Design a protein with these regions (language model features):
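A short alpha/beta connector and helix-capping loop motif
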Residues: 15-43
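Glycine/small-residue-rich loop that forms an oxyanion/phosphate-binding "nest" at active or ligand-binding sites
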Residues: 66-105
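Glycine-enriched alpha-helix->loop->beta-strand junction motifs that scaffold or abut catalytic
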Residues: 25-29, 51-53, 129-136, 152-158
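Hydrophobic faces of well-ordered beta-strands that scaffold small-molecule active sites
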Residues: 6-10, 29-31, 57-61, 104-108, ...
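Active-site rim beta-loop-alpha module in soluble metabolic enzymes
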Residues: 144-171
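Catalytic beta/alpha-barrel core
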Residues: 31-36, 115, 134-144
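Charged helix-capping and loop-helix junction motifs
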Residues: 119-125
Length: 171
């Protein structure tokens, strides 16, 4: 019989007050890296907490939309979006490495996550951004998403489900 496990991942470094209490309960964290929330101080603090708790560390880039917590679609040129994603992921990657860790994954946040799931052009920009940063990390994607289709075979994928949502047979 095959052993099945649940990988529990949580968005952290977003200004919440329970990051420290959540760390021992999860296997991975997605750290806000400046787009919708977070700054150098919160990234360093959250990375240290994750390393102390032996938690996998992921980047959680978003549209540069702090006013709406990254929940609204933003019109950006492909180049603007690419540079924004690269800048956010690279900032966190450098912090993780400076603290002696390794970036394990990337999970988009909010509207960017949803847009990349549905819009092939946005997915292509995301892929170009991530490929320019290397391929030594996993990518969290929704089932049956444009981003998942494009990333298949290029990145190791984790298909994600949310415990508080209902799902149809197609994911």
């Amino acid at each position: 019989m095959m052993k099945q496990t649940i990988h529990i991942n949580c968005d952290l470094g977003e200004g919440g007050e329970f990051d420290e209490k959540l760390m021992p309960l999860i296997s991975a964290c997605n750290i806000a890296c400046g787009g919708h929330a977070g700054n150098l101080e919160t990234m360093h603090r959250t990375v240290r907490l994750a390393l102390e708790n032996n938690i996998e560390i992921g980047a959680h880039p978003s549209y540069p939309d702090r006013a709406n917590f990254g929940r609204n679609h933003m019109e950006m040129t492909a180049e603007e979006l690419k540079l924004s994603i690269e800048g956010q992921v690279l900032s966190l990657k450098q912090i993780v490495e400076s603290e002696g860790g390794k970036l394990s994954h990337v999970k988009l946040h909010g509207a960017l996550y949803n847009d990349a799931a549905k819009d092939r052009n946005i997915s292509k920009v995301v892929m170009r951004s991530l490929e320019d940063l290397g391929d030594d990390f996993r990518l969290f994607v929704p089932v049956n998403s444009q981003l998942g289709e494009l990333a298949l075979g290029r990145f190791e994928l984790y298909y994600e489900a949310f415990a508080d949502r209902n799902y149809e047979d197609d994911g």
